[in-house]
Amino acid sequence: MSESNNMHVSGDGAKQSVYTEKKRVKVYVLENNEWKDTGTGFCQGTVEERTIDDTQTAEKMAYLLVVDEDSDDQVLLKSRLEQNIEYQRQEETLIVWKDLNGQDIALSFEESIGCDSLCEYICFVQKNIESRISLVAVRSTDDGIGSVHEIITGPVNLPSNVPNQTEESLLEALKILNENTSFDYLRNETIQFVINDHYLATLIRSFYQSEESKLYRNLLLLSNIVKTLILFNSKEILEEMINDENFLCVCGILEYDTEFPNSKLNHRQYLKDKEPNFKEMIPISDPTIKLMITQNFRLQFLKDVVLVRFLDDQSFTFISDLMLSYQNSIIDFLQEDSNNFINQVISMYKVEEDSTVTPDKRRDGIKLLHECIQLSQNLNSIEKTLFYKFLIKKGLFQVIQFAFNMETNNDIRILATDIVVGLIEHDIQLIQSVQSDEVTLLNDENSDIDSTDMSLLLILTKILLTDKSPGLKEQSFQALVSLLDPEDYIVDDYQNHDDNIDTRIDNMLQIQNGKNHDGLDGERNHEKFQLAEYLQCFYRQVAPSLFHCFIDGSVNLYECDQQLLIKLVKLLNLMIQGHEASISRRFILENGILIRLISLASSDYILQLRLAAVRCFKNIVFLNDDFYLRYLIGKNLFDPIFEVFKENLNEDNMANSTILDFLKSLNTQLKVVEQEDIPLSGSKSSRNFMLLNKYICGRYGDILLKADYVSFTREMMAIYHEETQKLASLSTTETSFDENDNTTLEVEV
């Protein structure tokens, strides 16, 4: 706000300057608890300057002046803005206050713009002439019952900034800072004080003095002060904290914690050991980007390590958003062709014989690319996809091939696998673009390019089967799960990447049984065709190696790694439930995999593996597939299942519960058939379950009868006897699964 040209000298010799335009207003005063209208006029903000005789210094005094609208000579109000008067702006057009004489005064403006003008004038006076006055906005709450006060301007209590801080001054500073977080105005004024008056430097100086003198109470107070400053959620304060000069000191202050007053963390030592490991493999020409990389690391260290127990949701989000702004800038820089940064990294893996590129440098390159992937995790989906496609197009998979085929360092191979997992979890269809010159989800129908390259699956299979690192095995397993999950392949924005494999299989079962099923429209037909081609290649090129221990009868499963067998059973379960039966079933049955699978239910193996085998077996049964059921019954593959049941018949454990759950599910299906009164010669669905019940009750009835503590085993036996009588009356001795099928199954009892 600037002084207008309207200036004159009053009768007492004071110079009067006008700071606002005239605004029409009504003046009210409170008398006997009622507001009295004292007239309508024009209000202005004025400043009078007088010379004090004793000191010959100029003194400025600010006034709210209202003159009558009909006569400029008649003053309706002249009120000085002084001392600790609080002005309240109520709603849009009202300013209310109590002067030093105790008189309540209100100005009601004709337009809100007039009220705005006078509020700006009050702010000007508070900043430049009378710092003790204040202006507060008062607004009604949404429910109309209460009111909300917000400071617009006013005196701000600030911490002492003297060089030598005492325990008392630090305690007072902490109190003031906590109070100043209550209102935006106080918060903003405090932020300006911290930045402009270099308050952080004062705290750091006090920290060194206190640590040297072992003033532990001061150190704890300093830690709480810095934490409170972080809660101001100011980019300026945070960036000052993480600059080269202050970061180590700030972390040192935060090593002290009032929750653990008798101990101290060692953030500074960690940083001294860690920060020298920052390597600039490829020179970064932009100093701003170099600074952002450092700032991003330091903010992440504060957020995830130093302040992990302290940050509230708002501050956590604020720091995360600030990091995201850095990360976006860094990712944008990496994608700029002009700086050639990624090209220089990828080129180290294109010529293996290049003696100028050392193995350590190639390892550092993989670490760098892994950091790039990690850096992109918080980007939105579209930006992340564009960045991943950029990396793939530049040759990311050449780096991964090197890591899997040439690198022997386990840590580096784990990082490479983590890169693959990150790509898969974001968008599995990116993997299908590896062999295409253009990074697209799928090749054109008329393209000669093979979109079903299995090299990545073969690499992951090799790692899963042969690598000695448990971490690498687990990552390879998760990558295979994602690559073999048809839901990931078909659904664009698949949201269940964090689901474990058992949850995925349950979802598939629901879809198979008609639940949770949205269907696929015609636009996805091409994707389904590509999926079928992809899976056929998998069963032809990869599955024989992946399930070699199940296919080769000479392999003693008991000598295999049982944790690996659990993973293979889960993958098998995924394939059986999720892949087209016409593709997966042939591979599984022709290679006798189910025979080896069910042998894992025996007592020779750990319980977790036995239960995984039983669950897989159960899921096969409830596919209600004619071919599988014929095979299972014909080969008597239920024997190991009921052997486990017999062993745990009277036990309250997972083995018993798992098999009881299988029997209960079968009984539920039988009840549905019975309630619908479907004859044995009815639908395939009904006949399959009735025949399965006949087989189970006939072969394992003695075990079922001993499980008399549950009702459904008795119900299964009752249905079995009833159906046996019906068959006897019909003189039927053999049953076909299909009236038009020449294959007849002798049900063994």
Curated annotation (Swiss-Prot):
InterPro entries: ARM-like (IPR011989), ARM-type_fold (IPR016024), EVH1_PP4R3 (IPR055236), P4R3-like_central_dom (IPR006887), PH-like_dom_sf (IPR011993), PP4R3-like (IPR051137). It comes from the Eukaryota. Signal peptide: none annotated. Its main location: nucleus. Pfam families: EVH1_PP4R3, PP4R3. One of its GO terms (cellular component) is nucleoplasm. Disulfide bonds: none annotated. It is found in: Nucleus. GO terms for biological process: DNA damage response. SUPFAM superfamilies: ARM repeat, PH domain-like. The keyword Isomerase does not apply. Core regulatory subunit of the histone H2A phosphatase complex, which dephosphorylates H2AS128ph (gamma-H2A) that has been displaced from sites of DNA lesions in the double-stranded DNA break repair process. Dephosphorylation is necessary for efficient recovery from the DNA damage checkpoint. Regulatory subunit 3 (R3) of the histone H2A phosphatase complex (HTP-C) consisting of PPH3, PSY2 and PSY4. This is Serine/threonine-protein phosphatase 4 regulatory subunit 3. It comes from Kluyveromyces lactis (strain ATCC 8585 / CBS 2359 / DSM 70799 / NBRC 1267 / NRRL Y-1140 / WM37).
